[in-house]
């Protein structure tokens, strides 16, 4: 059989319908189709799973126990398979120690660069700290012009107060006759008495020499004597020139600041040797945040200005506060902001040892009657956070704490010694703070000595290659110090992609999950070039993608469908993008050929005249911008990757609104103020996180339709005869559920050296309920059979029950009719979870004062899904609500009522408002990249 194809026979993972697929090797292959059609089942759960399993199978049983086992995918055979590497979006590191630099391994090379070519500079005296042997010192002095006059000095005292009489006695005993005191040369017997309270410098004059031939051995002796007397330091005073400083140690000859030998571990913030001792290399420290403790300073103490001390379950702290205020004469009915500075300090930081009488009786008769100092609210929270053994108390105290930049290392994570070492005039912390684009430019023009250039050449090549790859996948705006946990899924995936390109492997099967997410159209071409480069190295790329540019760039396109869930799982079309676009059965093909498209709305909403305004936003790269968000409109925030969209919407607007409207503890990013929030009642963030963390959560429970279904079952005659209430039909509580599997329907069996096996429960056979409960029927079906229904079937089944029908209809409206009511939440994709949340919002009665925020809602969505999503979003706005999206997808952007375009670039080059207004207005702004692409699509 030819080796130029991967041939799959009988793939049945999830909803795949026993399909046969042939995929050409060493090509860029795009797998597309509706959300839920089976693309990921083919790419990840079949191809990747089998490629990985075969590799792991080849290892010893001992090694396999550490790697974890993979199930054999449900497929008859796969031929022509290569070792598989999956680059998805879910495996982003949440470790606070992971940064862009560590994930890409650039930090490893930078540490090597600084260890081999770094110059330690004393932070106090700003002189270079060098370590030299006596021979090197002598050689350096002999390079001076002939007949130069020099004095070799031994600096025994540097900037120390005192008269130093014993020092002079010791010098005399050693037989030396001249000393230099505070820059003046004296005979040892004629040294004036020094001022006791002034700092002085004292150096012994070891030798006076004129540079000429034959003095080498004399220099050796003089240096050795100088170094011995001054603990490894020597100074050469060249008459008429600057002094030369020498040290046997990596230590400053003036203040003694020591660096030690330069080695790579000194520059690692994850090693005790290099980490800042104050923050342990995290760059941040937890501190109690005054703004979270007193979010509203216009309140009085009696009205609850101190949020952590408001009476919830105990009166202990409220009574303490009242008795303290009485004792110290503080008025509890004055707004906190109007209290004097001293009174505020007392409340926040404590009485500094001054006591007051505290009497307290608890509900159980316990009495406390003591004279105590007042601890202060901030100190109290900090102490309780660190001393408590209760997770609940620690979590509660954590709500009032925030991460502040470490004052010791200024957020650079490294200790003082590591930060003293510089290459090109900057230390590693400063280089890590530069954007990838700027770091590359800095290294390109780095000037090194001839010897350093030879050492640094291979190191710099590796660093520059990796930085270039990151820039080529549109990440030039990120800094190397950026924490990995703060990256979006798309950014994290492209970082791993850049790392793989850097590895230069060939013959590998790469499987990618929507690499274009979070990428502006402008950056897409560079990403595609990177993918082609990987292909040209001799790799097979299988990309699950909906982006039109990526599909058109593919060598081979596979369309899975025709629908989603049970309506999908078949190969609808395959071939070149041109061949697929000509296939009448392919939805993707119809969008590619332009036969189907998402229409531009006939008119744009003007809103209700009200707006929310964020004033002077300056978090991250935002340049002090003031932004209006019109209410009762569909608004999109656009801009190139890294321009500040997420900072503006997620870090400032969302958190500020949650703080004002929902009384949340979230602390918004830097801004002056926010106005207009009185016009909204709820802030709802509809993201792509799972709707539940356990298999017990499912669409029926999440949308609360299961409550109505259980009510219905409790009203049947059979249920009434047995006295069953609504709770009998829950699989989460004792009573109606199967106790053998606790309502899970499956039992986990742990296997050593093999994957854990999940088997259906032998008692209930996977039904989740006991036999008595399953005897209760509604219209011929029991509760377990209802959970096995798809939403579409359930809609037909319950069409005469308005309450249930309304909730199920909204799930169908968002395109999830194929999902079963009992499908575990953990098996829903991000896009499906997000649409389930939208469905849940749609069936709730709303007064039209909700503010919905969606961050890239088109992730994982086909053009047909996007058309459905837009209908749902427009429905929410038609009801008077406000919908705000962060989006790159032009089909969504062109349908918005109002755009806010940030830019012009990412990182430091972004953060300003380029254009606002309707899509038509933004399309006319020549400086806006979004506008340039919009113009093309609006003119189609």
Regions found by a protein language model. Give the residues of each.
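Conserved phosphate-binding elements of NTP-dependent enzyme cores
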Residues: 1-940
């Amino acid at each position: 059989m030819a080796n130029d194809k991967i041939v799959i026979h009988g793939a049945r993972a999830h909803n795949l319908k026993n399909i046969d697929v042939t995929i050409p090797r060493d090509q860029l292959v795009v797998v597309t189709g509706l959300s839920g059609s089976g693309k990921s089942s083919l790419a990840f759960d079949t191809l990747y799973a089998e490629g990985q399993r075969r590799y792991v199978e080849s290892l010893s049983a001992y090694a396999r126990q550490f790697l974890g086992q993979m199930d054999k995918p449900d497929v008859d055979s796969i031929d022509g398979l290569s070792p598989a590497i999956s680059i998805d979006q879910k495996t982003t590191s949440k470790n606070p120690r992971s940064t862009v630099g560590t994930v890409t391994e650039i930090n490893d090379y930078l540490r090597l660069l600084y260890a081999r070519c770094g110059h330690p500079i004393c932070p106090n005296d700003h002189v270079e700290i060098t370590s030299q042997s006596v021979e090197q010192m002598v050689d350096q002095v002999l390079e001076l012009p002939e007949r130069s006059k020099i004095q070799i000095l031994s600096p025994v005292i540097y900037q120390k107060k005192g008269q130093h009489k014993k020092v002079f006695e010791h010098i005399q005993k050693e037989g030396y006759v001249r000393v230099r005191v505070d820059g003046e040369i004296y005979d040892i017997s004629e040294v004036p008495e020094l001022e006791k309270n002034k700092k002085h410098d004292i150096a012994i004059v070891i030798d006076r020499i004129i540079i000429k031939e034959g003095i080498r051995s004399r220099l050796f002796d003089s240096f050795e004597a100088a170094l011995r007397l001054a603990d490894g330091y020597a100074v050469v005073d060249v008459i008429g020139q600057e002094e030369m400083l020498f040290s046997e140690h990596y230590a400053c000859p003036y203040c003694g600041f020591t660096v030690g030998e330069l080695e790579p571990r000194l520059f690692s913030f994850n090693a005790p040797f290099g980490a800042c001792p104050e923050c342990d290399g995290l760059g941040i420290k937890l501190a109690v945040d005054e703004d979270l403790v007193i979010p509203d300073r216009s309140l009085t103490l009696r009205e609850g200005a101190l949020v952590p001390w408001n009476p919830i379950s105990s009166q202990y702290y409220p009574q303490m506060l009242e008795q303290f205020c009485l004792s110290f004469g503080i008025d509890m009915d004055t707004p906190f902001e109007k209290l004097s500075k001293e009174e505020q300090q007392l409340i926040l930081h404590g009485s500094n040892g001054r006591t007051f009488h505290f009497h307290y009786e608890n509900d159980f008769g316990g009495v406390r009657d003591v004279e105590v100092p007042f601890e202060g609210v901030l100190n109290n929270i900090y102490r309780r956070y660190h001393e408590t053994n209760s997770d609940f108390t620690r979590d509660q105290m954590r709500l009032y704490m925030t991460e502040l930049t470490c004052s010791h290392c200024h957020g650079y994570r490294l200790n003082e010694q590591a930060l003293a070492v510089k290459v090109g005039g900057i230390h590693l912390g400063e280089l890590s703070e530069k954007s990838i684009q700027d770091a590359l430019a800095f290294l390109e023009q780095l000037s090194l000595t001839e010897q350093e250039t030879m050492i640094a050449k291979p190191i710099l090549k590796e660093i520059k290659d990796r930085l270039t790859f990151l820039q080529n996948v549109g990440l030039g705006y990120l800094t190397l110090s950026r924490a990995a946990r703060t990256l979006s899924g798309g950014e994290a995936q492209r970082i791993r992609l850049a790392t793989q390109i850097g590895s230069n492997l060939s013959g590998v099967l790469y499987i990618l999950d929507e690499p274009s997410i979070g990428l502006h159209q402008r950056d897409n071409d560079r990403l595609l070039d990177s993918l082609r480069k990987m292909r040209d190295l001799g790799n097979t790329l299988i990309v699950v993608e909906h982006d039109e540019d990526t599909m058109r760039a593919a060598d081979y396109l596979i369309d899975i469908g025709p629908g989603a869930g049970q309506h999908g799982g078949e190969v609808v079309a395959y071939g070149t993008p041109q061949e697929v676009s000509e296939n009448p059965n392919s939805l993707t093909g119809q969008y590619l050929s332009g036969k189907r498209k998402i229409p531009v709305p006939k008119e744009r909403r003007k809103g209700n005249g009200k707006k929310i305004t964020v004033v002077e936003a300056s978090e991250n790269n935002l340049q002090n911008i003031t932004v209006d968000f019109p209410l009762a409109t569909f608004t999109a925030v656009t801009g190139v990757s890294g321009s500040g969209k997420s900072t503006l919407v997620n870090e400032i607007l969302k958190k500020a609104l949650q703080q004002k409207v929902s009384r949340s503890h979230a602390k918004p990013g830097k801004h002056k103020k926010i106005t207009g929030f009185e016009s909204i009642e709820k802030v709802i963030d509809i993201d792509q996180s799972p709707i539940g963390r356990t298999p017990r959560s499912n669409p029926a429970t999440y949308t609360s339709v299961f409550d109505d279904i259980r009510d219905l079952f409790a009203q049947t005659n059979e249920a009434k005869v047995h006295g069953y209430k609504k709770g009998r039909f829950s699989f989460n509580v004792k009573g109606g559920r199967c106790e053998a599997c606790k309502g899970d329907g499956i039992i986990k069996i742990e296997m050593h050296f093999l994957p854990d096996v999940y088997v259906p429960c032998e008692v209930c056979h996977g039904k989740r309920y006991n036999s008595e409960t399953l005897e209760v029927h509604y219209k011929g079906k029991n509760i377990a059979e209802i959970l096995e229904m798809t939403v579409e079937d359930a809609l037909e089944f319950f069409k005469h029950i308005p309450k249930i029908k309304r909730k199920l209809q909204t799930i169908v409206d968002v395109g999830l009719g194929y999902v079963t009511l009992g499908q575990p939440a953990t098996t829903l994709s991000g896009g499906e979870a997000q649409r389930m949340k939208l469905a849940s919002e749609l069936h709730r009665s709303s007064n039209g004062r909700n503010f919905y925020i969606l961050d890239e809602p088109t992730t994982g969505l086909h053009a047909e899904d996007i058309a459905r999503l837009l209908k749902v979003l427009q429905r929410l706005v038609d009801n008077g609500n406000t919908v705000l999206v962060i989006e790159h997808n032009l089909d969504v952007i062109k349908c918005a009522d109002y755009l806010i375009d940030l830019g012009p670039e990412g990182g430091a080059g972004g953060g300003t408002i380029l254009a606002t207004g309707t899509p038509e207005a933004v399309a006319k702004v020549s400086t806006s990249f979004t506008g340039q692409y919009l113009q093309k699509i609006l003119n189609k």
